[in-house]
Swiss-Prot record:
SUPFAM superfamilies: P-loop containing nucleoside triphosphate hydrolases (SSF52540). The gene is cmpk1. This is UMP-CMP kinase. It comes from Xenopus tropicalis. It is an enzyme of class 2 (transferase). It is found in: Cytoplasm; Nucleus.
Length: 196
């Protein structure tokens, strides 16, 4: 069976991870965060990609698409090998730019079905405040204002155009992510009850 994929996009701090946890609990999806996979990979002492990933993340740049897709593909294959019923995936924080999207279409065409794009729309200042708050406890090296402003610029220049592209195909489901966690999840449930 082919993986059934929902791409989850939104700026840093839009609440993607929090909402994905709830979707997993309620709808049985497997959550794959492109960022978490990259962060885990760079910590592995024997990783062929570790140092490269580290330098990209530190500079707030987008990691080369081949690396990210190979990690996503491996994670989906491992999940499905362990449990044949687990074929629904939330892919969070990918595709981040046109190169990502083309790489996905080149590599995964016919191997996975993208059902829709869940887009958490949130103003930049709210996103920054949330990330600074999270940075106090998360220990993430990129949760500081300077890094965040770079990440938001990257997001606006690179990821927003992807959302616009998907909007033309009618695949984008947009949620106002500036509301409380519960209010946002109510909207998310409406979408998943209809779509998948």
């Amino acid at each position: 069976m082919k993986p059934f994929v929902v791409f989850v996009l939104g700026g840093p701090g839009a609440g993607k991870g929090t909402q994905c946890e709830r979707i997993v609990q309620k709808y049985g999806y497997t959550h794959l965060s492109a960022g978490d996979l990259l962060r885990d990979e760079r910590k592995k002492p024997d990783s062929q990609y570790g140092e490269l990933i580290e330098s990209y993340i530190r500079d707030g740049r987008i990691v080369p698409v081949e690396i990210t897709i190979s990690l996503l593909q491996r994670a989906m294959e491992q999940t499905m090998a362990l449990d044949g019923n687990k074929h629904k995936f939330l892919i969070d924080g990918f595709p981040r730019n046109e190169d990502n999207l083309q790489g996905w279409e080149r590599t995964m065409n016919g191997k996975a079905d993208v059902s829709f794009v869940l887009f958490f729309d949130c103003d930049n200042e709210t996103c920054i405040e949330r990330c600074l708050e999270r940075g106090k406890s998360s220990g993430r090296s990129d949760d500081n204002r300077e890094s965040l402003e770079k990440r938001i610029q990257t997001y606006l220049q690179s990821t927003r155009p992807i959302i616009d592209l998907y909007e033309k195909t009618g695949k984008v489901k947009k949620v106002d992510a500036s509301k409380s966690v519960d209010e946002v999840f109510t909207k998310v449930q409406d979408i998943f009850d209809r779509e998948g």
